[in-house]
Amino acid sequence: RNLMIAQQYVHDHVMHFYHLHALDWVDVVNALQADPAQTSAIQQSISAWPNSSPAYFKDVQKKVQGIVDSGQLSIFANAYWGHPAYKLPPEVNLLAVAHYLEALDAQKTFTKIHTIFGGKNPHPNFVVGGVPMPIDPNSDTALNAERLSIIKDSIDRMIQFVDQVYIPDLLAVAPYYLEYASLGEGLGNFLTWGEYPDTDNDDTSKFLVPRAVIMNRDLSHIEEPNPNDFEKMKEFVSHSWYEYAGGDNAGLHPFAGETKFNFTGPKPPYEQLEVEQKYSWLKSPRWAETPMEVGPLARVLAMYAGGHKQTQDLTNFVLKTLGAPIEAVFSTLGRTAARGIETKVFADYMLDTYNGLIDTIKSGDTDTFNGDKWDPMTWPSHAEGFGFMEAPRGALGHWCVIDNGKLSNYQMVVPTTWNASPRDHKEQAGAYEMSLVGTQLAVPDQPLEILRTIHSFDPCMACAIHM
């Protein structure tokens, strides 16, 4: 299961950087002005990635030229090419565009672990208490030596791409946008539920990613949150299109959560929302009545503060390379760098976990799940369950209540619900809103600067709204 989760991280973060975020910084059309020989020299100076010849980059340039000449920009449509906020030289733009295309192809390799263990990607199959793939070296339909070899090759290729493409590209692009090392912070409060248990979910001390609450940037004081604390873990709907029986100022723990629609917004078409009223389909999750940021930056800070040496070394290396102070991590650029840092940590972790799996199989332990709770007859008449993980976008929790064998309540609090939440009963804004305070636009009707910060969170509005 840890291998499947780690694979999702590496896949998701690489795809996010190149296909959902990089083009906020990279001007694709400007890459046509590049000298492929100079791009080749840049590539060879930053990593040993084999696709580095002038001819290779010339071919990429021809592909882009063909798209532009067609008059239909295809995958590169709906952008602000030529915007004055783009600062990369043409040669770095060409480098990034080449890797954008390579990352599309790399997905075929990245997803093999999900396909083998979980049957498909996206949305691989899990089972309660483990994973569905049996282990049998002598079976063609189970996890055997051939499939283990495919998994090992996939891990090696992911590590190579992260080491030789993703991280070098981050460090090649970031120096041109150092002003974003002091923009886009937001809240300064961070939350993680923790991830990658070494033994079981109850022993949080063995998690690779600690369960942590960090308040006001204070890395010297880490609190371990209890997701089932009815006093601290609450959702509010003061500015959401829902209503609670206890009124708009009430906060409810997810076990007692209510989802009753109360749309009071304007009828389309409209140009703006009345933010002093209800204005969002998202609820407002709060920890101790405080808005929190979740996601890669929260996890990197938790690991850094918790003494995880590789995270500390990587973070310090990035800051030193960019000539930035530690405070720079609390920013749009810091959030983007954190995603790369944890991708490197989790890619390396996959190799260690794979080796541990091999040792476990050799010892004769081939169990892949615990089915003790599968029979509903073993359940009490009233039961409450909490499932959690650190999804790539951040802390994810599902709370369910079961009465007489049937679900009587089910509430989800997902990463984007935390980050994109509207104001709460105390008029406290969520992470997205706060991160945009002070943002200035070079071209008001082309809000590239806003996209850079919002995309640094990796939004998923479809995940965040539950109707």
Predicted regions and their residues:
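A translation/RNA-centric and nucleic-acid-associated enzymatic feature enriched
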Residues: H398, D403
